Amino acid sequence: MIAPAPGYRISAATGLHRGDRAYQQDQVELLLHPRVKGCALAVIADGMGGKSGGRKAADQVMLTAQQTFERYAPGRDDAQDTLRQMVTEAHLMIRLTAITAEEEPHSTLAAFLLNPAREVAIAHAGDSRIYHFRGPQLLSRTLDHSFVQRLIDEGRLTEEEALTHPQGNLLTGCLGTQQDPPITLATIERLEVGDALLACSDGLWHYFTPRELGAIIDGLPPRDASEMLVNKARQRARGGGDNLSLVILRLEPLG
């Protein structure tokens, strides 16, 4: 925990599990700014591409995130521009690693950047998600760059039907492809005390409704909530679970 300003503290935790896959190709980072209190970056990457390509792609996302955040200066640099640059640079570096990979490496990305003024910048590409909760209530979440999300947008599929659709894992864009990655940016003007952010890969969110996520994240400290979400996802996967990764960050009142 860190206490960036009077009245609240930041409480956070990460989670990572291989699931039932042979290889771990998800990666997660929660970074505190080296020079500015109350500034943090959370990043999720879900890599794809053979036994090594996906891991290389996810690792490249993490390395680029670390380097970008190291250069970031709150108050001087625009947070959304910084996240856009991070996605673009990671995409280009993944493209370079494709030269030595047995399969073309790809990765999703979901990231949020919290500034000391409690403004949050959000970026995502692919089907890794970011949820914003106030208490147990969902205020917003990112929309996937996926085939089934397109069907949902067109009114041809419900959220529930999308979970069991045979092409549910087909992405319409991500990092490392020959096309530029889709980058969806958003801003939360001010995170309130009691608010929580969840970034996670599809290996986690696939097994929960937003109501369940909100109840668990609101009812437990972030570390305990992370452990419960991982354990429940593993149970519900019934031996067929994907890699999963998550970050929970919550503003808590002091005292």
Protein language model features and the residues they cover:
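PP2C/PPM-type serine/threonine phosphatase catalytic domain
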Residues: 1-255
